């Protein structure tokens, strides 16, 4: 009887794993390695998290650092796209076949052709998002979206007609798939993740990110819809309640570098898969960059001596009473430039005033070391040590 029970439990575990929807993530050279301009990124983060009339998702400029993308399809038969899965916005958009032939960014990426899809439904509502280099604009359409082997039917998304700025040209991905709360969805569109759950494609309204930090690995990581993969992390999750259902925002206890403590008495933080950096208030980040021996170079960037990485101080983020540590190798970015490798700090200063700020933004520098679970059913974010 005991053996039968064990077998049954094993079978249930296998079935639970099978119910996950998995999308492989690929890692590419970030567009920021072509256009390194932290000042531009700071402007975009301000727009993203400091909108005058409430949260407004911003689609691209702080994706200068987005290195991880995955494959989706839209339409019947399926048309393929590479998208960044972004927890800091809630809409899905891809370039449209109807974009102007003078739009270089559009020409260089995969484009959705409504005329070639038998499941296309016209919507036509105007769509636009304002950011530093101009406005991404287009219109809404509805079609079937495929990802991880499942099909999300009647999904409304944006066809982008105008994609301004060189960032679009350099990007290795075609569009963005937002995974934030519906409250920040432009035009009130129901996000893809919501429809996945509502249509019974996943058992639980949970998704999780595993980012492979091994540069020699074939795959960049994985996003799992429906739960978390226990093979990708060790120990238990530390859960933090979402205190603002827009972005994945929560309370952080403190940030520590040696005996120096920042974010005193607690502060607000956001887990954002749309950027690889960690951002925080300018005065505090400046102090952190000095503490790690960073040398200011240009546009808010700090260079670090690559040979000193093993000796750099541990930086600890205290979340839910537990310390999540980053070593020098975790928070220093190696960038190839003119045939040489330079090392840049993964910390960026940005001041976001009240009521939305001040904020810390934990991007891929943090998520790469700590497997991250986004649990919309319980309105919480969980962190565990990635394998």
Swiss-Prot record:
<keyword id="KW-0378">Hydrolase</keyword>
<feature type="active site">
    <location>
        <position position="86"/>
    </location>
</feature>
<comment type="similarity">
    <text>Belongs to the peptidase A1 family.</text>
</comment>
<comment type="function">
    <text>May degrade organelles involved in the biosynthesis and secretion of vitellogenin.</text>
</comment>
<feature type="glycosylation site" description="N-linked (GlcNAc...) asparagine">
    <location>
        <position position="123"/>
    </location>
</feature>
<dbReference type="GO" id="GO:0005764">
    <property type="term" value="C:lysosome"/>
</dbReference>
<comment type="subunit">
    <text>Homodimer.</text>
</comment>
<keyword id="KW-0865">Zymogen</keyword>
<keyword id="KW-0325">Glycoprotein</keyword>
<feature type="disulfide bond">
    <location>
        <begin position="306"/>
        <end position="343"/>
    </location>
</feature>
<protein>
    <recommendedName>
        <fullName>Lysosomal aspartic protease</fullName>
        <ecNumber>3.4.23.-</ecNumber>
    </recommendedName>
</protein>
<dbReference type="InterPro" id="IPR021109">
    <property type="entry name" value="Peptidase_aspartic_dom_sf"/>
</dbReference>
<dbReference type="InterPro" id="IPR034129">
    <property type="entry name" value="Cathepsin_D-like"/>
</dbReference>
<keyword id="KW-0064">Aspartyl protease</keyword>
<dbReference type="Pfam" id="PF07966">
    <property type="entry name" value="A1_Propeptide"/>
</dbReference>
<feature type="domain" description="Peptidase A1">
    <location>
        <begin position="68"/>
        <end position="384"/>
    </location>
</feature>
<dbReference type="InterPro" id="IPR033121">
    <property type="entry name" value="PEPTIDASE_A1"/>
</dbReference>
<dbReference type="GO" id="GO:0006508">
    <property type="term" value="P:proteolysis"/>
</dbReference>
<feature type="propeptide" description="Removed in mature form">
    <location>
        <begin position="19"/>
        <end position="53"/>
    </location>
</feature>
<keyword id="KW-0458">Lysosome</keyword>
<dbReference type="InterPro" id="IPR001969">
    <property type="entry name" value="Aspartic_peptidase_AS"/>
</dbReference>
<feature type="disulfide bond">
    <location>
        <begin position="99"/>
        <end position="106"/>
    </location>
</feature>
<dbReference type="InterPro" id="IPR012848">
    <property type="entry name" value="Aspartic_peptidase_N"/>
</dbReference>
<keyword id="KW-0645">Protease</keyword>
<dbReference type="Pfam" id="PF00026">
    <property type="entry name" value="Asp"/>
</dbReference>
<keyword id="KW-0732">Signal</keyword>
<feature type="signal peptide">
    <location>
        <begin position="1"/>
        <end position="18"/>
    </location>
</feature>
<dbReference type="GO" id="GO:0004190">
    <property type="term" value="F:aspartic-type endopeptidase activity"/>
</dbReference>
<feature type="active site">
    <location>
        <position position="272"/>
    </location>
</feature>
<feature type="disulfide bond">
    <location>
        <begin position="263"/>
        <end position="267"/>
    </location>
</feature>
<keyword id="KW-1015">Disulfide bond</keyword>
<dbReference type="InterPro" id="IPR001461">
    <property type="entry name" value="Aspartic_peptidase_A1"/>
</dbReference>
């Amino acid at each position: 009887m005991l053996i039968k029970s064990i077998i049954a439990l094993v079978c249930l575990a296998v079935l639970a794993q099978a119910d996950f929807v998995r999308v492989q993530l690929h890692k590419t050279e970030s567009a920021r390695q072509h256009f390194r301009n932290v000042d531009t990124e700071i402007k975009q983060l301000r727009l993203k998290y400091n909108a005058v009339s409430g949260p407004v998702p911003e689609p691209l400029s702080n994706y200068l650092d987005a290195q991880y993308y995955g494959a989706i399809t839209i339409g019947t038969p399926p048309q393929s796209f590479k998208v960044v899965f972004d927890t800091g916005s809630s809409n899905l958009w891809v370039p449209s076949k109807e974009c102007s032939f003078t739009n270089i960014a559009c020409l260089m990426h995969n484009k959705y052709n409504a005329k070639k899809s038998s499941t296309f439904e016209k919507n036509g509502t105007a769509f636009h998002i304002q950011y530093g280099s101009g406005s991404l604009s287009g219109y809404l359409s509805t079609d079937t979206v495929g990802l991880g082997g499942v099909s999300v039917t009647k999904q409304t998304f944006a066809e982008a007609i105008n994609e301004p700025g060189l960032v679009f040209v350099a990007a290795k991905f075609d569009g963005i798939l937002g995974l934030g709360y519906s409250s920040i969805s432009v035009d009130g569109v129901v996000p893809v993740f919501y429809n996945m759950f509502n249509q019974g494609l996943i058992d639980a309204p949970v998704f999780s990110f595993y980012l492979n930090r091994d540069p020699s690995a074939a795959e960049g990581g994985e996003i799992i819809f429906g739960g978390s993969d226990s093979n990708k992390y060790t120990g238990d999750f530390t859960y933090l309640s979402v205190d603002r259902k827009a972005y994945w925002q929560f309370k952080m206890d403190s940030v520590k570098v040696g005996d120096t403590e920042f974010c005193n008495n607690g502060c607000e933080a956001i887990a954002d898969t749309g950027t690889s950096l960690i951002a925080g208030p300018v005065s505090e980040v400046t102090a952190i960059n000095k503490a790690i021996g960073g040398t200011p170079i240009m546009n808010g960037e700090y260079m670090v001596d690559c040979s000193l990485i093993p000796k750099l101080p541990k930086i600890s983020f205290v979340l839910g009473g537990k310390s999540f540590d980053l070593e020098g190798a975790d928070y220093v970015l190696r960038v190839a430039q003119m045939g040489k490798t330079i090392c840049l700090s993964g910390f960026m200063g940005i001041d976001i005033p009240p009521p939305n700020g001040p904020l810390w933004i934990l991007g891929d520098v943090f998520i790469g070391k700590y497997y991250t679970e986004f649990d919309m059913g319980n309105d919480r974010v969980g962190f565990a040590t990635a394998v």
